[in-house]
């Protein structure tokens, strides 16, 4: 991803650094509208995910995470921006006339050909079962359940690594550092997700953040005691606790949030490191 730096003409653009413009021209049969009514609230109207609200209207792009077009070659026609994710998407024209969106693999350009199936070449953008991949292959868009479609390593710049195969399972090292077992029959896409430099972006002003549906973040220590456990005190006071807490009083910053005795515990060989 090419980073574009603005000229220092105004305060709002002085620190701005955004990616080069990638246009979006979605196909009508591959998009549909979404009714965004939650804004971070649950069914009872209580805020469960903070700092969300507003934002520009979006049309959802139908992404092909399953890659069901087996042994049919497709050609990358466009590389487009998707407002629903950090990664770019590619429009693929298959030989049988189908047109679908997939996640943009890093390094793929317009005109490249891709294919999915068994015993296909180990080439960037191709999708095939883990059993047909050599050890050390970099992959993304990984299935957890056979036939359900890719669920792991789909964010911009995400990449996992195939480190072992034994019996009916394959061992993967995920982007979070977690090492886990997955069925060798599950499929994945070769390569890394594109738009790697997305974390280098600096929007430069609060208005650009609002367009994305992200509201301001306020520290708990500057609130009143009725609003946050860290609030209150005279002047710049400490939080008054041994450990930081969430607005609802639960331990924050380091507490394990994974459900205990989950069915997949025996599949995780090493917990994530971040």
Curated annotation (Swiss-Prot):
Transmembrane segments: none annotated. Keywords: Chloroplast, Plastid, Ribonucleoprotein, Ribosomal protein. Residues 1-22, 224-274 are annotated as: Disordered. The keyword Zinc does not apply. It is found in: Plastid, Chloroplast. GO terms for cellular component: chloroplast; mitochondrial large ribosomal subunit. One of its GO terms (molecular function) is RNA binding. It comes from the Eukaryota. Coiled coil: none annotated. One of its GO terms (biological process) is mitochondrial translation. InterPro entries: NA-bd_OB-fold, Rib_uL2_dom2, Ribosomal_uL2, Ribosomal_uL2_bac/org-type, Ribosomal_uL2_C, Ribosomal_uL2_CS, Ribosomal_uL2_dom3, Ribosomal_uL2_RNA-bd_dom. The keyword Flavoprotein does not apply. Belongs to the universal ribosomal protein uL2 family. Part of the 50S ribosomal subunit. This is Large ribosomal subunit protein uL2cy. It comes from Glycine max (Soybean). The gene is rpl2-B.
């Amino acid at each position: 991803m090419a980073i574009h730096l603005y000229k220092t003409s105004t305060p709002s653009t002085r620190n701005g650094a955004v990616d080069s413009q990638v246009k979006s021209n979605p196909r009508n049969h591959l998009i549909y509208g979404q009714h965004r009514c939650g804004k971070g609230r649950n069914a009872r109207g209580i805020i469960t995910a903070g700092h969300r609200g507003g934002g520009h209207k979006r049309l959802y792009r139908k992404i092909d995470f399953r890659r069901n077009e087996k042994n049919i070659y497709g050609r990358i026609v466009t590389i487009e921006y998707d407002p629903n994710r950090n990664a770019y998407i590619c429009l693929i024209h298959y030989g049988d006339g189908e047109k679908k969106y997939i996640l943009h693999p890093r390094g793929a350009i317009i005109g490249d050909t891709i294919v999915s199936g068994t015993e296909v070449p180990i080439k960037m953008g191709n999708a095939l079962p883990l059993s047909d991949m050599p050890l050390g292959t970099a992959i993304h868009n990984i299935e957890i359940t056979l036939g359900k479609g890719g669920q792991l390593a789909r964010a911009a710049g995400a990449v996992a690594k195939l480190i072992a195969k034994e019996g009916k399972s394959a061992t993967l090292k995920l982007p979070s550092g977690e090492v886990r077992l997955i069925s060798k029959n599950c499929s994945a896409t070769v390569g890394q997700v594109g738009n790697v430099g997305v974390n280098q972006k600096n929007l430069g002003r609060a208005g650009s953040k609002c367009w994305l549906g992200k509201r301001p973040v306020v520290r708990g220590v500057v609130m009143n005691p009725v609003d946050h456990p860290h609030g209150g005190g005279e002047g710049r006071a400490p939080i008054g606790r041994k450990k930081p807490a969430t607005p609802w009083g639960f331990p924050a910053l380091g507490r394990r949030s994974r459900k205990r005795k989950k069915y997949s515990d025996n599949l995780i060989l090493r917990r994530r490191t971040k």
